[in-house]
Amino acid sequence: MGLADRIKKLREDWKRIISVAKKPDKSMFYLNLRVTLIVLLFVGLLAFLVQLAFSILLG
């Protein structure tokens, strides 16, 4: 399978995904946004605490 065939198949796959996908309604979008931001905040806080602990322990 050549490069042109791969690109053609990839384009067809993307078309199929786009045709099946649907836009989320406003409430689902905001729920996803809130969950994403909470997880991002949690991971950032965890990384900060780990860095703080290592800087205190190692001087």
Curated annotation (Swiss-Prot):
Q: Which residues cross the membrane?
A: 37-57
Q: What topology in the membrane does the UniProt record assign?
A: Single-pass membrane protein
One biological process term from GO is: protein targeting
Q: Which GO terms describe its molecular function?
A: protein transmembrane transporter activity
Q: Which GO terms describe its cellular component?
A: plasma membrane
Endpoints of the signal sequence: none
Localization per Swiss-Prot or TrEMBL: Cell membrane
Q: Which UniProt keywords apply?
A: Cell membrane, Membrane, Protein transport, Translocation, Transmembrane, Transmembrane helix, Transport
Known partners and oligomeric status: Component of the Sec protein translocase complex. Heterotrimer consisting of SecY (alpha), SecG (beta) and SecE (gamma) subunits. The heterotrimers can form oligomers, although 1 heterotrimer is thought to be able to translocate proteins. Interacts with the ribosome. May interact with SecDF, and other proteins may be involved.
* HAMAP family in alphabetical order: SecE
Q: Could you tell me what this protein is called? A: Protein translocase subunit SecE
